Amino acid sequence: MTPLTPFGAAAGAVTERLRRASTGLRTSEEPRWAHVPSESITVTTEDGVALHVEIDAPESASRGRRHLAGRAPTVVLVHGFALTMECWVLQRRALVRHGFRVVTYDQRGHGRSGLPDLETCTIAQLGRDLDTVLGVTCPSGPVVLVGHSMGGMTVMSFAGQHPETVRDRVLAVGLVSTSPGGHDITELGLGSVAGRVVGSLGPGVLTRLSRHAGPINVIRRMGKNIQDAVVARWAFDSPVSPGLVDRVAEMIFATSFDVMAAFLPDIDSMDLAPDIVALTGVETLVLNGSGDLVTPASHSEQIVRILPGAEHVVVEDAGHIVMLEHPELVTEQLLMLIARAQRAVAEGVAVASKPRVRRTVQDISKKRRGRRGGREAAS
């Protein structure tokens, strides 16, 4: 029998905890991943990378719904590091039902988008990519920009590069589980000592791993317990279905190691504080999970300190990928953000003069479902 390593034992323990914790979750809580957009297109960036873009038109029954300040904005959802547009699937559906046109896309080197030259894997380039996507999919009219993790960095970088577009067209911004930089993000919640090792060795280690794709793919197939342990630790802070853990693991481990390695140094050294200033006067939601190990609350607090009038929402029992862990709650916060922004425009409210607000919210419905399911499983 092969001896069990300490990490293997820990992985097994985490997986068993996941199994027990998810016993109370109904199968209906497993997201329906298949989604048919109204339109799928390819947008080519300035340097020739093909980005996979999907557009959802509002449901016909919602098109006549009245929106404050006139025309309903297009909502653009931007995913994070080592994920794909799929992580926004539940918000896409909900926003469409509420009468919004939605644009999502896979960032360069992720999902169904093309692989770029590795030297272009920078946050500044992602900001330029977002500008290109906007120019093709919604060249006029109001927009709401929502970014998760590296997607939030993309939005901030775009704002710094295109302040005039922000001033003229951006109705609202959602920055979810993200960071302005300056926090040694590649510590990944490991602590200062271990984190410094990861921060210094991570990109090189990933690059070396990418040269041995065959063995790594074998590990991917055989190491499900380890994958589950990694995802459970860094993605979530409350019980989720095993299927959700599997799907997030698939997104992460399907991302090219070369691409991961190329982005990490730029993420670790970036400073987006000057870019954030361009969002002054824009209704902004800054949201993070209380148990986020990748971008803890201190990252969000730094953004809020720079941005007058921002609303800071902390979600209890939530990890880094909060929009999949607590989808209904995140959707509700996005709808509230858009409503606040539309009301501010209609009433002539100066957003920058509003007081900063910090709220802590909890997904009560999920807790109730978990308790109810646990009782049913025990009976």
Give names to the regions the model predicted.
Residues 1-44, 57:
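An N-terminal hydrophobic leader/cap segment in hydrolases
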Residues 76-80, 148, 288:
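The conserved beta1-alpha1 loop
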Residues 164-215:
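Flexible "cap/lid" loop of the alpha/beta hydrolase fold
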Residues 301, 305-379:
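Catalytic active-site module of serine/aspartate enzymes centered on a nucleophile-bearing elbow/loop
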Residues 209-278:
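Conserved alpha/beta-hydrolase catalytic His-Asp/Glu region
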